[in-house]
Amino acid sequence: MANVIKLRKGLDINLKGKAAKQKFSVKAAAQYALVPDDFVGMTPKVVVREGDKVKAGDALFVNKKQTDVKFASPVSGVVQAVVRGDRRKVLRVVVEADKDQQYVDFGQKQVASLDGDAVVKALLEAGLFGYINQLPYAVSTTPDQKPRAVFVSALRDMPLAGDFEYELQGNEEDLQTGLTALSKVAPVYLGIGAKQTSKALTEAKDVEVNVFDGPCPAGNVGVQVNNIAPVNKGEVVWTVDPTAVIFFGRLFRTGKVDLRRLVAVAGSEITKPEYAEVLVGQPIADLLEGRLAAKNHVRIINGNPLTGRKATMDDFVGGHTSEITVIPEGDNVDEMLGWILPRTNDFSVSRSYFSWLFGKNKEYALDARVKGGERHMIMSGEYDKVLPMDIYAEYLIKAIIAGDIDRMEQLGIYEVAPEDFAVAEFVDSSKLELQHIVRQGLDMLRKENA
């Protein structure tokens, strides 16, 4: 029977524009792109040139520091461009897709007969290993980092997040195959939500199922690691998105790299929020065509409103993206008296507005404004109310800002990822970019321990 872990700390932010459980069709794109920045902590080395012919599954770039970690093309076609930015940083590799797709055949495998080394080798050869992240440091892992355990969270509870159970329909076999494969490497802990009922999750085999009952960010894999088996110095755990587990399962079942995924197109500026089945690297413009309520004064987000990246119509669906969100930018708003005016349509954690009288089910159309500038940390205890982890979050942030590595280690930086602080950043009256601060601290520590 599954373990039930109840979490009281957190905050559910109910936004307008949640995707209905319906699919809309998206045409096959002429171009697809793989973006190295989607794989945090990895320095890319491009292994193709413009004009090269590739199949789906061929490597476009590798990890420069560990070249056996490849990153596979989502489609077959001709490499159209290797786009670089400042200091020749690789921004993306663009492939012009064939009309008839061709795949590298990696061979079907029976995962029950494989050992851990064989599983890792298969993922490396197919260019899928880079979809595995690790704690500490919250970066794309490498095969020399032997994990103590593998954590998979099937609970998506960030604002406007897509329903993984809906995405799972038709992919149950691949999910189980992927979980079984990962269990050959290390014990697997599967985190699900209290309201999730799919048997593919509740009765998953070869894993330990843990049910998390609580508000956002209960679905964050870092929160789940902290509440099940915290990471100590010198230990490594893998964290894997459940969609990536499906990718792994498809590889072992079919012998092909198939990066199809269901993406929620959501937000108050979307006329008809629904799901689209697309490939990793699909142009965002294809998903938003004819669905924007307004073409100007909107914020397009590659991901969810709290942890996603600001995007444009020229960007592409990310390697870990499960939703594309569009909300008002807020740059054309003229409010009389600003925050002083009593109102019922603005969200407030501290009940400064009367909107709390309408209950927790009221939906809000929040915009992208921060509504204030960065200021000193005066209010104590704000982070602790919404961060269900056994750490002193405020003191950890101060230690990172001060660059005190010893103090950072003592306060549990090995256990956290930037997205764990997303809700804390939302409620922070000091308007600090907590996720950016945590990322800087993790990078500093990783460099120090290299």
Give the residues covered by each predicted segment:
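Mobile cofactor-carrier "swinging-arm" domains
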Residues: M1-L15, Q22-K23, Q80, G85, ...
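N-terminal, Lys/Arg-enriched amphipathic/low-complexity engagement segments
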Residues: M1-V47, V62, F212
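Short, solvent-exposed loop/turn positions at domain surfaces
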Residues: M42, V48, K65-D68, K272
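Short, well-structured beta-strand-loop connectors
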Residues: V48-V62, A81
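Short coil-to-beta-strand transition motifs
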Residues: D68-S76
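Buried, small/hydrophobic-residue-enriched core segments of structured protein domains
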Residues: V69, V83-D286, G290-A450
